């Protein structure tokens, strides 16, 4: 090291200006009280006091003052003479964030009092939310945990007013209130609907203070990736490098390489900031490379960089790489991306830590790091430091880590600041707009002089790096003392305290002997590093000199983010077989509660999780500012008295005082660590009485300001007195044979989500079964202890793997008579060759012939695969299972020229998959329903099952079911009431509303079980979520929501329907109030002056237009909805609506026309309103319109209405609108007054109602629903009301026997214990004659369901004209991949001007799947509102059809090759008039080998 010395100025002027006692030792009593300048309310804090030269016991008091009030924190706390200790205190709270604290020390002869500002911070407890995984599919269950701890990470039994789930549209879809965290943790879950809004959801936890903690997760339709594409390349490269090596690898989730084609695309894109006038020069520069992956699944390419013009500006300063890997055999292609920054800064210097202040006579020190452009340390290089303004120059050499410790002797320094610039290489100063030059960054730092009137100092030697928990760190302290002041002293006491997490953590003292006259030297303090000090601690040390001067220093230490609760998680081994038993061991502090999680690595590949980590936990701690500065708050100053700034003449020389001293002092050091110091010692630098703006020596810039401005790259200006901390740039087996077989069918995404309490020894264990997925599982845990607090485990892995396994490839469904190739692929991941036998289990359900000859065994060497195929022709209908087994054999035979080894464990892998085998033609269903009510007599019903002449052979099947409850069938099928799609806002309500009626009915009849309740509640939750997809921003709802087009208005009818349903569902699930309020407000704006409601939006059901006019029918419906919410009759909206209806009824009653539909709604509306007279008038009028058949009663629309076609022995099925209007009449009979219970109905009304019920019950389908949505909803409401009115809890039972003319006989027992149980039997004789006998006492509901397929027959009177054509798009002769287009033309040819909403249901030809983008694109057409892909069907929703032809097309592609392809049907039907339908068939254009379209 070499140094250039410059003369230093004397302190003469300062000496003359200082008070006379600055150099005179005294022994006056000295008090120091230390309190954090920011304190937490409700959390214990400490006030520390040290006394010097106090020869008596004194009393310490702390008083908090705010708003003219005083609160005693410490009252007359006795403090022994010459002691140093801390006393705890707690501030319960303050209405103001800034208050004052007064310290008073008094004794027999002493009194000291001072006041200073402090800030009170409300200590919000750290809270975090953990979900079981970061991404979910529609219909999955979201599981999450809420955890609360205090600032010491101990569990907090906190109660949160509300926890809720928020959708991407900020709708609240689920809510829990008053959630109490026993032991600091609570687990919750909720189901996503099968059709939720996709995007980012939030779990929101709201605290009592109103603060919200949010945790996000994503809902997305996804397929878990089988493998990951990894790009290995350097993150940064120098712009002078000529080659860039890139490696792309494919790795399965279970760790094995992916065979396939690797394609690399390497680009340097042009900068968007560059002008576009350079034409071709502005284009991106790209190169492409392609090659088969090697045996490690990788492709390595060394890219020449010359083509990318790295020295030229105007392009992005990075190289971007995209790698695609197409898996061999499947064609599955996944992508990975990577990038490499281009750097012209070939070296970087940075201070990792450096003194912020300097003290003359003590070494100024710091540490610098030298790295190259990649962040790699540069060792054994000379670096130069220059200290200004003195010009000192020093040379240091970096070590093997690129670090150099800098130490500068400051013995002769007197400047108010110093600046240190460290340089490795000088830069060539030249700038070119289009050309890059080599650049080397410097490290630049400024430090400020610490003022001491006696030139006495203490300084903490810098400690570099992060301190590990549990270690003892020796801290070296340098000191320099004024000999004149200390000459009579035998020792000096140094006091130190440690501040962590904003509070005083620990304290101590060190007595330094001065008997040897050692006024300059070093001593050490051992500091024990504890978890409570993390993540950063401040060490403050000070001493009080005999001249009353206080000298001090402070330093920040980075502490390892550790926890007192050490958590260890382990599996017995790193690899296990699928479906094997294992256990997860956890060890932590005794009696901890541990939360365990294990997730499929595939999920994390899809969406990497922001998992719990020490960093994320520590980030939750409430923050205190280091300095505790109070901006804009009055602070009681305790500066020294000012000194004169006038010129002084000495020995004939005139001295001008230096103004605006930029030095730091002891006070600023305490302030830098957020400590308020109350003392009578000298802690301030001199202050001149006159403010003087100009500082001539520095050209008008104050030294401190210059120090800030001068800090350049690599420096950081931090709290005064605390050294700056920088960031690093760098980122043998027993041969006993055991046959082991695995049958794999359990494939979860989250495997473990459990709470495990630990025993007194701190051990716990969870026994689990490894799922069947061959993948890597990532497991982690956190534990909570009341004593040691929170602890986190590291993430551990378990590979679920077996040395070989089997994969089956087969289609979803085929038509009887078709043949397909079943492929079984065996993968061997052992290091040696083995003999494998692959068998397909024989079954009478199919015929399987091996393809390419039959071999007893197959040889598969390490990391190879073998595919075995069978040509399969199904023989049975329905779900046909295929069971394939691969077994490793003990065999001495050679595999080619390689020896086979006998596996240590001979494994069998069995995979079971199914194919649905469907009959030809289209499916038809007929039902026969009857209500049988024997009263201690035997009733008998003879009936027969017949089949139509065009039935497809073998397709017929029939069942007979018995239920003791009229709603029993619906209860069994709450989510499957209709065999129709549910893809719009109204259809979704049929999944939602019946659950309310079922819950209310079972509650009222005291039959509700937990199982039914749980199921219905979950359906309500799911339906609520889905319905919000159809909500508009104004609170209204429409059939397709915003999906129907940006300008689609809200639908008045649907909004009323949703409003009523949400209001009624509130008693069962959480419904956000604003959804009800906003819908009602929107609906209110649609009410006209006459009380009627105007229509908004398109009515998809024409039946609503069948009344006098749309307005009356609609108004009646909305009035019913408002009354059922329920709103009182006195409410203005209801009162006005009833006026509208009364006016309409007056008009209708004078009319000669029969408005049955409208009258049915009016009757129910007046019944709900309690208007007996109007109800009676309407029911009397309706009675004249009734259709009376034997013991049943119903209503139908005027005119000759065509019934739904049925076989002669079945009752004709009524159209949807007639079921709906009949159900409304039934509701009117069952509602005499809204306030009266249903059971108070007259016997006359009940008698009429029972006749209506008999007719309605006969219209039910086999799932408990009816034809369409509205008839199902209203009819189930009416049936539930009737069921409640007639329910009796009888101990009697009914016996039902069904017999055929052959030998078949089956008896059912129905009683109060099993009345909700569905009892069913398959009928053997088709066709056949049967008799049903009923005896006992009570009512039973009987249903016979017959299903069969028929071949489509052209009908000249079809209500829809349907034309289908197919055209090949890609005719692959090999048959590996074929695509074709389906072109559909459709129009309405029925009797109405237009249809209702229409569904086009396109079934896929076997082995083909739709190309989803082409299906989605159909929604761009004006009349097509929505499309769905549902297994092997494409559903297209059309708003309405007229006689104008609507044409559209989409593409399909081959998924699995199938031979002898059969045609597939396309069905077009009216959603609300399901008897109006047309069916056509189409064939794949490859079926006959031609390339022409056919249908």
From Swiss-Prot:
The UniProt keywords, alphabetically, are:
Bait region, Disulfide bond, Glycoprotein, Protease inhibitor, Secreted, Serine protease inhibitor, Signal, Thioester bond
Cystine residue pairs = 48-86, 249-298, 267-286, 469-562, 594-783, 642-689, 833-861, 859-895, 933-1339, 1092-1140
Q: Where are the transmembrane segments?
A: none
For this protein, the record's CDD domains field holds: A2M_2
Q: Where in the cell is it found?
A: Secreted
**Renumbered residue ranges of the record's region Bait region:** 686-744
Going by the entry's taxonomy, the superkingdom of the source organism is recorded as: Eukaryota
Tissues expressed in: Highest expression in liver, medium expression in ovary, heart and stomach. Low expression in lung, kidney and uterus. Protein found in plasma.
Signal sequence, renumbered to the chain = 1-24
Per UniProt, location of the Isoglutamyl cysteine thioester (Cys-Gln) cross-link in this chain: 984-987
**Positions annotated as glycosylated:** 55, 157, 382, 405, 412, 568, 881, 942, 1003, 1385, 1443
- Cross-referenced SUPFAM superfamilies, in alphabetical order? Alpha-macroglobulin receptor domain (SSF49410), E set domains (SSF81296), Terpenoid cyclases/Protein prenyltransferases (SSF48239)
Gene Ontology MF term list: endopeptidase inhibitor activity; serine-type endopeptidase inhibitor activity
The UniProt similarity line reads:
Belongs to the protease inhibitor I39 (alpha-2-macroglobulin) family.
Q: What does this protein do?
A: Is able to inhibit all four classes of proteinases by a unique 'trapping' mechanism. This protein has a peptide stretch, called the 'bait region' which contains specific cleavage sites for different proteinases. When a proteinase cleaves the bait region, a conformational change is induced in the protein which traps the proteinase. The entrapped enzyme remains active against low molecular weight substrates (activity against high molecular weight substrates is greatly reduced).
The protein's name in its UniProt record = Pregnancy zone protein
């Amino acid at each position: 090291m070499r140094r250039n010395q410059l003369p230093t100025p004397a302190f003469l002027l300062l000496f003359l200006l200082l008070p006379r006692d600055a150099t005179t030792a005294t022994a006056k009593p000295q008090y120091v009280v230390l309190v954090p300048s920011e304190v937490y309310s409700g959390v214990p804090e400490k006030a520390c006091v040290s006394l010097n030269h106090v020869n008596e016991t004194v009393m310490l008091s702390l008083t908090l003052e705010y708003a003219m009030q005083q609160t005693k924190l410490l009252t007359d706390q006795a403090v022994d003479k010459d002691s140093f200790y801390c006393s705890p205190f707690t501030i319960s709270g303050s209405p103001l964030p800034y208050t004052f604290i007064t310290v008073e020390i008094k004794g027999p002869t002493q009194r000291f009092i001072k006041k200073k500002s402090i800030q009170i911070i409300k200590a919000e407890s750290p809270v975090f939310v953990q979900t079981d995984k970061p991404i979910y599919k529609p219909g999955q269950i979201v599981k999450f945990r809420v955890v609360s701890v205090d600032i010491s990470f101990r569990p907090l039994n906190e109660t949160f007013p509300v926890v809720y789930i928020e959708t991407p549209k900020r709708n609240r879809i689920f809510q829990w209130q008053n959630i109490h965290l026993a032991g600091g943790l609570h687990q919750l879950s909720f189901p996503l609907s099968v059709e939720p809004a996709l995007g980012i959801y939030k779990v929101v936890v709201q605290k009592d203070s109103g603060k919200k903690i949010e945790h996000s997760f994503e809902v997305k339709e996804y397929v878990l990736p089988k493998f990951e594409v990894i790009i290995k390349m350097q993150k940064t490269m120098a712009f002078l490098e000529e080659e860039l090596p890139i490696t792309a690898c494919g790795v399965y989730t279970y760790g094995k390489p992916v065979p396939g084609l690797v394609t690399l695309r390497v680009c340097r894109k042009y900068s968007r900031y560059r002008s576009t006038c350079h034409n071709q020069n502005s284009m991106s520069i790209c190169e492409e490379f392609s090659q088969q992956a090697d045996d490690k699944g990788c492709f390595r390419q060394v890219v020449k960089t010359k083509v990318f013009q790295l020295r030229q500006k105007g392009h992005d300063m990075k190289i971007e790489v995209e790698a695609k890997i197409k898996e061999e055999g499947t064609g599955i292609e996944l992508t990975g991306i990577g990038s490499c920054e281009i750097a012209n800064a070939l070296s970087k210097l940075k201070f990792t830590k450096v003194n912020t202040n300097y003290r003359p006579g003590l070494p100024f020190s710091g540490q610098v790091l030298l790295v190259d452009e990649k962040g790699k340390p540069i060792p054994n290089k000379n670096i130069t430091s220059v200290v200004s303004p003195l010009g000192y120059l020093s040379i240091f050499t970096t070590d093997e880590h690129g670090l150099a410790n800098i130490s500068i002797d400051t013995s002769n320094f007197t400047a108010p600041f110093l600046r240190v610039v460290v340089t490795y290489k000088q830069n060539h100063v030249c700038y070119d707009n289009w050309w890059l030059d080599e650049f080397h960054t410097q490290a630049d730092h400024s430090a400020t002089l610490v003022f001491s009137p006696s030139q006495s100092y203490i300084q903490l030697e810098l400690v570099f790096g992060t301190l590990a928990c549990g270690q003892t760190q020796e801290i070296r302290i340098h000191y320099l003392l004024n000999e004149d002041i200390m000459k009579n002293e035998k020792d000096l006491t140094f006091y130190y305290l440690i501040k962590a997490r904003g509070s005083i953590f620990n304290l101590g003292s060190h007595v330094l002997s001065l008997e040897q006259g050692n006024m300059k030297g070093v001593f050490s303090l051992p500091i024990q590093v504890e978890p409570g000090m993390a993540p950063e601690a401040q060490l403050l040390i000070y001493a009080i000199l005999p001249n009353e001067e206080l000298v001090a220093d402070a330093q920040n230490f980075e502490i390892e983010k550790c926890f007192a609760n050490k958590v260890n998680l382990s599996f017995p081994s790193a690899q296990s077989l699928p479906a094997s038993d294992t256990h997860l061991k956890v060890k932590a502090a005794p009696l901890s509660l541990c939360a365990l999680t294990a997730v499929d690595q595939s999920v994390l590949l899809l969406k990497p999780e922001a998992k719990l980590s020490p960093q994320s936990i520590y980030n939750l701690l409430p923050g205190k500012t280091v300095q505790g500065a109070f901006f804009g708050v009055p602070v009681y100053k305790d500066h020294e008295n000012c000194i004169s700034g006038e010129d002084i003449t000495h020995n004939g020389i005139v001295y001008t005082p230096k103004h605006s001293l930029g030095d730091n002092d002891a006070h600023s050091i305490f302030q830098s660590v957020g400590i308020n110091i109350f003392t009578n010692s000298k802690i301030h630098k001199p202050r001149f009485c006159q403010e003087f703006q100009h500082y001539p020596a520095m050209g008008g810039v104050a030294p401190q300001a210059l120090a800030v401005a001068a800090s350049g790259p690599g420096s950081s200006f931090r709290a005064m007195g605390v050294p700056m901390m920088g960031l690093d740039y760098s980122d043998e087996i027993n041969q006993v044979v055991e046959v082991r077989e695995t049958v794999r069918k359990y494939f979860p995404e989250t495997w473990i989500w459990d709470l495990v309490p630990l025993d007194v020894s701190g051990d716990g264990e969870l026994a689990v079964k490894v799922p069947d997925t061959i993948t890597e599982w990532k497991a982690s845990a956190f534990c909570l202890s009341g004593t040691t607090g929170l602890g986190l485990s590291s993430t551990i892995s378990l590979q679920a793997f077996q040395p070989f396994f089997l994969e089956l490839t087969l289609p979803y469904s085929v038509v009887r008579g078709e043949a397909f190739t079943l492929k079984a692929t065996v993968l061997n991941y052992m290091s040696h060759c083995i003999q494998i036998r692959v068998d397909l289990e024989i079954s009478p359900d199919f015929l399987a012939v091996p393809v390419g000859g039959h071999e007893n065994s197959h040889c598969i060497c390490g990391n190879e695969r073998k595919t075995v195929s069978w040509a399969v022709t199904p023989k049975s209908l329905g779900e046909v299972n295929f069971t394939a087994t691969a077994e490793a054999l003990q065999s001495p035979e050679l595999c080619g020229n390689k020896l086979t080894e006998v596996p240590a464990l001979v494994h069998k892998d069995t995979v079971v998959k199914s194919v649905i085998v469907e009959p030809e033609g289209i499916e038809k269903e007929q039902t026969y329903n009857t209500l049988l009510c024997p009263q201690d007599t035997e009733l008998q019903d003879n009936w027969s099952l017949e089949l139509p002449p065009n039935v497809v052979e073998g397709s017929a099947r029939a069942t007979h079911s018995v239920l003791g409850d009229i709603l029993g069938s619906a209860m069994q099928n709450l989510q499957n009431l209709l065999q129709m799609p549910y893809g719009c806002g109204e259809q979704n309500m049929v999944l939602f509303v019946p659950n309310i009626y079922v819950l209310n009915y079972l509650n009222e009849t005291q039959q509700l079980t937990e199982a039914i309740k749980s199921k219905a509640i979950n359906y309500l939750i799911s339906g609520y979520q889905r319905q919000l997809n159809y909500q508009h921003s104004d609170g209204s709802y429409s059939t397709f929501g915003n999906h129907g087009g940006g300008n689609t208005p809200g639908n008045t009818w649907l909004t009323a329907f949703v409003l009523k349903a949400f209001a009624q569902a509130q008693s069962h699930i959480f419904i956000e109030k604003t959804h009800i309020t906003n819908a009602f407000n929107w609906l209110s704006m649609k009410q006209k002056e006459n009380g009627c409601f105007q229509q908004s939006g398109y009515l998809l059901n024409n039946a609503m237009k069948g009344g006098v006019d749309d307005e009356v029918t609609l108004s009646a419906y909305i009035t019913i909805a408002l009354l059922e919410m329920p709103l009182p009759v006195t409410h203005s909206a209801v009162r006005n609506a009833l006026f509208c209806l009364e006016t309409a009824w007056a008009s209708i009653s004078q009319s000669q026309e029969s408005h049955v539909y409208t009258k049915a709604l009016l009757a129910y509306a007046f019944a709900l309103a309690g208007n007996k007279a109007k109800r009676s008038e309407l029911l009397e009028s309706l009675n004249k319109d009734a259709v009376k058949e034997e013991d049943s009663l119903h209503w139908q629309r005027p005119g000759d209405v065509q019934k739904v076609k049925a076989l002669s022995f079945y009752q004709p099925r009524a159209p949807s609108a007639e079921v709906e209007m009949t159900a409304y009449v039934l509701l009117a009979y069952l509602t005499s007054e809204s306030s009266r219970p249903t059971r108070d109905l007259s016997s006359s009304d009940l008698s009429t109602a029972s006749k209506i019920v008999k007719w309605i019950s006969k219209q039910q389908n086999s799932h408990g629903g009816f034809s369409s949505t509205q008839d199902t909803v209203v009819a189930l409401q009416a049936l539930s009301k009737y069921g409640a009115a007639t329910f009796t809890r009888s101990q009697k039972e009914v016996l039902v026997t069904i017999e055929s003319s052959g030998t078949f006989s089956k008896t059912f027992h129905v009683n109060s214990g099993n009345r909700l149980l569905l009892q069913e039997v398959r009928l053997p004789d088709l066709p056949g004659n049967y008799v049903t006998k009923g005896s006992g006492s009570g009512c039973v509901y009987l249903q016979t369901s017959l299903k069969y397929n028929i071949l489509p027959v052209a009908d000249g009177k079809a209500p829809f004209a349907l034309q289908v054509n197919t055209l090949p798009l890609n005719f692959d002769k090999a048959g590996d991949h074929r695509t074709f287009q389906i072109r559909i033309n459709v129009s309405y040819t029925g009797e109405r001007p237009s249809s209702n909403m229409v569904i086009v249901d396109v079934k896929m030809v076997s082995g083909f799947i739709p190309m989803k983008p082409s299906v989605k694109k159909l929604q761009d057409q004006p009349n097509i509102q929505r499309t769905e892909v549902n297994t092997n069907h494409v559903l297209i929703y059309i708003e309405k059809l007229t006689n104008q032809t609507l044409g559209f097309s989409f593409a399909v592609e081959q998924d699995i090759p199938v031979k002898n392809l059969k045609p597939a049907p396309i069905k077009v039907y009216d959603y609300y008039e399901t008897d109006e339908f047309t069916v056509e068939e189409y064939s794949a254009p490859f079926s006959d080998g031609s390339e022409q379209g056919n249908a």
